[in-house]
C-alpha cells in the first residue's frame, strides 16, 4: 500500500459536459513509475477518516507532483466529494517494485518503507531527506 497526502484539488470541465476532480498528491512518478511505464491501473481510497456518505462521490484523477503530463497515478476513480487537502489516500496493491523502481527525479526524495505488525510499526527503510541527496554532491 502506498500512502499519499492530498496537496491540491481542482475541478475541470470535460468535453462531454461532465467534470473531473484532479487530486494532486505528495508523490508521483518518482515513487511509482508503473502507471507511466506499463499503464498499471490502480484505485485509491481515503485512509485517514471515514468520509461522509451524505457528501456522495465524485469522478477523480490522482496526479503526482512532477511537471510531467504523464504523472498520473490513478486515472479514473470515484472518491468522496468531501475530499480535502491534507486527506491521506491509500493506493493498494502497488506491488513490491515501488522502492526499487523509485528515483530522485526532479531532486525529489524517495519515500520510506514501513512495516506494521500486531499494532507495532517501524521503518524497513527510512524516508530520504534533502540532506541525503546533497551528501552525494561532488565538490
List PLM regions with ranges:
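Charged (often Lys/Glu-rich) extended helix/loop segments that serve as interaction or gating elements
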Residues: 1-139
Amino acid at each position: 500500500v502506498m500512502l499519499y497526502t492530498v496537496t491540491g484539488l481542482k475541478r475541470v470541465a470535460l468535453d462531454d459536459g461532465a467534470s473531473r476532480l484532479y487530486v494532486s498528491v505528495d508523490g508521483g512518478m518518482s515513487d511509482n513509475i508503473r502507471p507511466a511505464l506499463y499503464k498499471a491501473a490502480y484505485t485509491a481510497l481515503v485512509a485517514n477518516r471515514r468520509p461522509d456518505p451524505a457528501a456522495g462521490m465524485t469522478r477523480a484523477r490522482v496526479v503526482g507532483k512532477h511537471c510531467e503530463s504523464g504523472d498520473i497515478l490513478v486515472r479514473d476513480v470515484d472518491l468522496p466529494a468531501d475530499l480535502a487537502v491534507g486527506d491521506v489516500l491509500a493506493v493498494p496493491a502497488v506491488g513490491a517494485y515501488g522502492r526499487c523502481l523509485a528515483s530522485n527525479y526532479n531532486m525529489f526524495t524517495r519515500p520510506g518503507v514501513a512495516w506494521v505488525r500486531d499494532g507495532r510499526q517501524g521503518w524497513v527503510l527510512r524516508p530520504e531527506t534533502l540532506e541525503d541527496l546533497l551528501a552525494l554532491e561532488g565538490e
